[in-house]
Swiss-Prot record:
Transmembrane segments: 145-165, 252-272
Superkingdom of origin organism: Eukaryota
Protein name: Nuclear rim protein 1
Species for this entry: Saccharomyces cerevisiae (strain ATCC 204508 / S288c) (Baker's yeast)
InterPro entries: Nur1/Mug154 (IPR018819)
Compartments where found: Nucleus membrane
Quaternary structure, from the entry: Interacts with CSM1.
A Pfam match: DUF2418
PANTHER family reported for this sequence: NUCLEAR RIM PROTEIN 1
Biased amino acid composition, Polar residues: 430-440
Keyword line: Membrane, Nucleus, Phosphoprotein, Transmembrane, Transmembrane helix
Gene responsible for this protein: NUR1
Other facts noted in the record for this chain: Present with 606 molecules/cell in log phase SD medium.
Amino acid sequence: MGSNDLINEAYDDSEVVGEERESKSAWMKRWYQLLTSPLDLQLVINEKLEMINWDAYAKSLAKPLGNFLTILFFIIRLLQDNLIKPNYYKLNVKSGAFDLSKSNKLKEFDYLWEISSSFQNNNQFYAFQSWYFVTLRFLNNLFRFTIFILLSLNLYVSCKFMFGYFKTYNLFHLKKEFNSPNLTKHNLKDLSKEYYEDIYKQSLWSMLKHFFRGSRDDGPHVNQNEDEIFFQLRKWIPTNFMINLFVSFSPTAIVFLSFSDVSFTSAIAIVFHQYILDYIITKRFQRSVDDDLILSSAALQEYEDKHIMARINQCSNIDTLSSAMGTRSKTPRIFTTHSLCGEEIREVYNYEKREFEALPKMTESVPGSRETRIKDYGGISQVSDHQSHPIGFHYSPRMSPYYRDKVLDNNLAQSSSNENLEKGGAYLPNQDQNRPSKSLSPLRKTPLSARQKRFEGSEFNVLNKNDINSILRSPKKKKNYHKR
């Protein structure tokens, strides 16, 4: 590679030229977009303004800005009443009203012309052309323009504060109608697209009325159900930035300064007005609203801790009754849910498999046996017929002897009844609950009258009647049954 090639590579500015062309083309595209679609620029500016957290600048920007605008308005009104108003006639007098040099009659007579010229020089008819009055005239025009800008800005801030911060809430679960002008009643059909299509078909006045007022339906709704009606709340929620700006640049102070003669003593009234308004709205009313939010949050948190979390968390329900073991947690073992079709599903948690298992469905025609009910109460998925007590059934220290004796008596009674029934051929209605299939049960092959006669003649008649009565008890009385 020669020296010329190295020099050409060192001084190769093709990349720089390409970047300059790209920058120029980008600027051309931006100017073209600005000229062809100015609304896009407006959308971008509004998006940038909405992304700013204005409430964070409420104390540092809004309040000083409002106080500065109020003081500026006071100074301008003070100068207008004490500097411009005394010289109002001299500033607004016409320059050619008493100009005798322009009179043709006086020019015809020489002595009258001399008198008129001396009279004008001695009385200074052209005093308004001096630098002092020229400056006052400029200040007068500047003050008028500034007053117009400040009044327009104050009008915009006031209208924005009072009418520009409303949020609409649709309340579908509210049943009681409150006496509030912001709460209106509507039909659920108003939320459909057909409702808006009907509005577009109406007159221009109806469309404008709906655009500015919204959909209002204050009728009695006599022929409508409560499920077809919802309430709409239009709540006024001004931002913290706008509240501080409105308080510091209030329309009451501006109106007071506009229609009164302003002097230095008027500053005392303005300072007192600013302090009282800031104290009432910002330090009292706004803090009262914040305190209400704190109380509402505390009440909601208390409800969540006591009712919602107590049902979600199994270990949060604490039994505070005095016992030998102290306080212990009560964990529900059987969980009742519903499927998408509305069917009730009863599940129990298996600690060995660490998963939920569905319990067999309980029908009204065939009640469950005592063993099945004890199994459901204890939360066990499988129980063997030859065991003295269910697997995994945990008794308390005080109630374990009672439950153990009950289960042993129940197993002995069932085993003896089964042996006797195999010999005698009688069948009881609570024998086939643990069998896999109901179609293979011999109870269905024996008529009901024969079963009843054999059951009444059995020696275990009293025992089985008590057993059936205990099984047919209400599920809500399980605790009373076990405690008895």
